Protein backbone atom coordinates (compact mmCIF):
# COMPACT_ATOMS: atom_id res chain seq x y z
CA UNK A 1 0.00 0.00 0.00
CA UNK A 2 1.27 3.47 -0.86
CA UNK A 3 0.76 6.13 1.77
CA UNK A 4 -0.37 9.63 0.88
CA UNK A 5 2.27 12.34 0.79
CA UNK A 6 2.54 14.17 4.09
CA UNK A 7 4.76 16.96 5.31
CA UNK A 8 6.39 14.84 8.02
CA UNK A 9 8.19 16.19 11.07
CA UNK A 10 11.84 15.12 11.05
CA UNK A 11 11.37 12.82 14.05
CA UNK A 12 8.73 10.64 12.33
CA UNK A 13 10.25 7.25 11.47
CA UNK A 14 7.05 5.23 10.92
CA UNK A 15 3.59 5.94 9.49
CA UNK A 16 0.41 3.87 9.60
CA UNK A 17 -3.32 4.20 9.01
CA UNK A 18 -5.94 3.18 11.59
CA UNK A 19 -9.16 1.35 10.69
CA UNK A 20 -11.07 4.67 10.82
CA UNK A 21 -8.87 6.25 8.12
CA UNK A 22 -6.60 8.33 10.38
CA UNK A 23 -2.92 8.40 9.37
CA UNK A 24 -0.40 8.72 12.21
CA UNK A 25 3.32 9.35 12.38
CA UNK A 26 5.47 7.67 15.05
CA UNK A 27 9.01 8.17 16.28
CA UNK A 28 9.36 4.48 17.23
CA UNK A 29 7.73 1.44 15.64
CA UNK A 30 4.12 1.39 16.89
CA UNK A 31 2.17 -1.54 18.26
CA UNK A 32 -1.05 -2.81 16.68
CA UNK A 33 -4.36 -3.06 18.52
CA UNK A 34 -7.80 -4.16 17.32
CA UNK A 35 -8.66 -0.93 15.40
CA UNK A 36 -5.32 0.73 14.76
CA UNK A 37 -1.85 1.51 16.06
CA UNK A 38 -0.46 3.06 19.20
CA UNK A 39 2.91 4.47 20.21
CA UNK A 40 5.13 2.31 22.30
CA UNK A 41 6.27 3.52 25.70
CA UNK A 42 9.36 5.31 24.38
CA UNK A 43 7.88 7.05 21.34
CA UNK A 44 5.83 10.04 20.25
CA UNK A 45 3.05 10.25 17.69
CA UNK A 46 1.26 12.87 15.61
CA UNK A 47 -1.97 12.82 13.60
CA UNK A 48 -1.02 13.39 9.95
CA UNK A 49 -4.43 13.41 8.27
CA UNK A 50 -7.50 11.37 7.39
CA UNK A 51 -8.65 9.43 4.35
CA UNK A 52 -11.38 6.91 3.67
CA UNK A 53 -11.06 3.90 5.98
CA UNK A 54 -8.86 1.17 4.52
CA UNK A 55 -10.13 -2.43 4.76
CA UNK A 56 -6.50 -3.60 4.84
CA UNK A 57 -5.28 -1.00 7.34
CA UNK A 58 -3.08 -3.61 9.06
CA UNK A 59 -0.86 -3.53 5.95
CA UNK A 60 -0.22 0.24 6.06
CA UNK A 61 2.66 0.32 8.55
CA UNK A 62 5.71 1.74 6.78
CA UNK A 63 9.15 2.80 7.92
CA UNK A 64 10.30 6.20 6.69
CA UNK A 65 13.72 6.52 5.10
CA UNK A 66 15.39 9.85 5.94
Regions found by a protein language model. Name each.
Residues 1-6:
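Surface-exposed ligand/attachment interfaces on beta-rich extracellular proteins
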Residues 40-66:
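Low-complexity intrinsically disordered segments
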Amino acid sequence: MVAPTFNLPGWVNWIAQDADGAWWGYSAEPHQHDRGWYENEVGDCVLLGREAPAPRWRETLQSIQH
